[in-house]
Structures are given as C-alpha cells and as structure tokens.
Amino acid sequence: MPFTFKLFHVDDSRCGMPVSTDGVLLGAWAPLVQAKTILDIGAGSGLLSLMAAQRSQAKITAIELDNDAALDCQQNFDASHWSERLEIICCDIQAYCQREQARQFDHIICNPPYFANGPQSSKFSRATARHTDSLSFDALLQAIKQLLAPEGQASLILPTESVSLLEAILSTYNLRLCHKLLAASVEGKAPNRQILVLGHDLKAKKIHNFGTELQAVAQQQLYIREKTGHYSLAFTLLSQDFYLKL
C-alpha cells in the first residue's frame, strides 16, 4: 500500500514487506552523522535509504534480492528529491560482496529477515522478506565485516528473541556491539525490538571482567506508544520529520 511521508512517497505494492514501524524506527534512530557512504542491505521498497537520504548528504547504495521489490525501490528513488544520491542494485548480498571486494561504506543499515523457522507465508516474496532463509545472520555479518569501513558502524533492528543468536556469533566476524536501543511497543511492556549498532572489534575501550575483555556498550530504552495509545514523546521526536501527522 502506498505510504506518503513529509518529504517522500513509498510505493510498496510489489514488495514482500510493507512500510512498518520497525523500519521507521531504525531509519530515524540509526547514527548516520558524518556518514558519506551508506549501504542498505535488503532494501525492499527503499524506505531506509530514503530516510537516510533525508537525514544525511551521503551517497546511498541499496541492495535488494527480489526483482519486484527492486522495481518499487527504483521507482521510489526516482520520484524522490535525492535520486542523484540513491542507487538500487538487484542481487543478493553475497554476489555483491564478490563483485565489490574493495568497496567499503561508512554506515550499513539493515532490517533483516526475522523468522528463523516456522510456517512460510503464502506469498513467496513476503515469506522471503520475513524468513532468515534468504539472509542468514552469518551471511549478514560476513557482509558487514567485508563492506564496513574500519571506523564505520552498522545498524540492525531485530526482535528481542533473536538478538542473543546474533550476539553469540559477533566475535566470529571480529565485530562488536557498540550501542543498543531497547524498544517496547507500549509503555510498561517488555522490549520486543532492539536496534543494535555494530562496529569492527578494534580493541579500543575495554572493561576487564574475570580475565575476559569486554567492550563497553551504551544502552537506551524507548517505548513507541503510551498506555493511552498515543505515540510517546520520544518516538514523536524521532519520527516527526517523517510522519505527516506529527
């Protein structure tokens, strides 16, 4: 269903996953300050890329596996104010890594597939967008390891129940957790989404704990709606540059 924001329009009619609060939260919160190049892995309709273009002056490359979604993405890019800074490439991230072995980005953003197993959706493209079969955590982290600039950061949004699976394999790819946002859908509820900001493990700032070196991780919390059903002040401040009615 087409979705109109303050400065751009998103047509996701051919895309497996529609515009979501998850995407808006990640696009609004990701720390993009001073990023000159941004990579959007699994771009879908291009929402994250368009939000990044509005928030920065970066050159943005979007990678999307599904051809129909890539067509939506290209259409949305062409209709935006920032078309000269946006490009969409239709391929999987592994193929892109092989083709662009020397290229690196200041920031990587990704709203990855989040169902590791379970029944597939009746619509194949929606199933592909929702299941990690199309982009495993190992494949994602390998791509981040290769494509992220030495001082760059990668921002991902995941369901809380999937976070430990990803965190457990970060060290395998010499990546570390730098920052975490715990997001609850409603005030008083447990966080059901987390944004993880990753970086290369450069052994910069450490805390020693029982002989094991641990990196200090900044952590924030946010709830999207108050108990009344209205958007919280924190989410309103984050998203007011994008949503029409805020």
Swiss-Prot record:
Protein's UniProt keywords contain Coiled coil: no
Function: Specifically methylates the adenine in position 37 of tRNA(1)(Val) (anticodon cmo5UAC).
Keyword presence, Isomerase: no
InterPro entries, per the entry: DNA_methylase_N6_adenine_CS, rRNA_Ade_Mease_Trfase_CS, SAM-dependent_MTases_sf, Small_mtfrase_dom, tRNA_Adenine-N(6)_MTase, tRNA_adenine-N6_MeTrfase
Gene3D superfamilies (UniProt xref): Vaccinia Virus protein VP39
GO CC list: cytoplasm
Superkingdom of origin organism: Bacteria
Compartment(s) where it occurs, according to its Swiss-Prot or TrEMBL record: Cytoplasm
Assigned protein family: Belongs to the methyltransferase superfamily. tRNA (adenine-N(6)-)-methyltransferase family.
PANTHER family: TRNA1(VAL) (ADENINE(37)-N6)-METHYLTRANSFERASE (PTHR47739:SF1)
Catalysed reactions listed for this entry: adenosine(37) in tRNA1(Val) + S-adenosyl-L-methionine = N(6)-methyladenosine(37) in tRNA1(Val) + S-adenosyl-L-homocysteine + H(+)
Protein name as catalogued: tRNA1(Val) (adenine(37)-N6)-methyltransferase
Record organism: Shewanella halifaxensis (strain HAW-EB4)
GO terms for MF: nucleic acid binding; rRNA (adenine-N6,N6-)-dimethyltransferase activity; tRNA (adenine-N6)-methyltransferase activity
SUPFAM superfamilies: S-adenosyl-L-methionine-dependent methyltransferases (SSF53335)
GO biological process, one term: tRNA processing
EC code(s) of this entry: 2.1.1.223
